[in-house]
């Protein structure tokens, strides 16, 4: 079967946002481990959604617009720190992925080239295993603190989007108000 010979990776899943068990099959939502394995996925980037401006669109979004994720955080009873800290939101979602990886030998966090090589070797030996990568949707997850890059890295993040739908301290988003490039931040 052709699909089993391909190296399939998906670079954007917001599944950790919703508080579902990533190890159990669901009939809704983006991904879960059983469906990833059935689809032959080798790599899944779990991107952390930390802010979604109300009225989000592809033309222009204000960074100071009311935030949809705050409402979700309240509804899901996230820890209080995640109500107003985008960094805390990223760490909460990362913890959900890390917890799932710790509970299943079929999901492994990719932090290094060695981890990736090990994953590929196991898959070549016929093991059903998926590599999990952590990333942010926008550098606003830094909460304006460059030291948070090191903290995200230590937690397992290996990708950080610069902007996502609105401007932040690092620069202007294609969908933001300033339409500017990178800042000195």
Language model features with spans:
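N-terminal hydrophobic targeting/anchoring segments and the immediately downstream early-domain regions
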Residues: 1-179
């Amino acid at each position: 079967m052709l699909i089993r010979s391909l190296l399939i990776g998906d670079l954007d899943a917001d599944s950790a946002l919703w508080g579902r068990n990533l190890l159990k099959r669901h009939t809704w939502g983006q991904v879960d481990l059983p469906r990833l394995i059935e689809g032959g996925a080798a790599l899944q980037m779990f991107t952390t959604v930390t802010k979604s401006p109300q009225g989000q669109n592809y033309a222009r979004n204000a960074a100071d617009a009311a935030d949809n994720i705050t409402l979700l955080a309240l509804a899901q009873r996230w820890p209080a720190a995640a109500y107003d800290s985008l960094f805390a939101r990223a760490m909460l979602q990362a913890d959900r992925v890390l917890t799932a990886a710790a509970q299943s030998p079929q999901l492994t966090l990719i932090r290094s080239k060695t981890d990736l090589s090990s994953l590929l070797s196991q898959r070549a030996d016929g093991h059903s295993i998926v590599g999990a990568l952590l990333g942010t949707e926008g550098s606003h997850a830094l909460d304006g603190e460059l030291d948070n890059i090191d903290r995200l890295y230590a937690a397992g993040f290996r990708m950080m989007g610069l902007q996502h739908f609105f401007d932040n301290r690092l620069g202007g988003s294609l969908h933001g108000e300033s339409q500017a490039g990178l800042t000195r931040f």
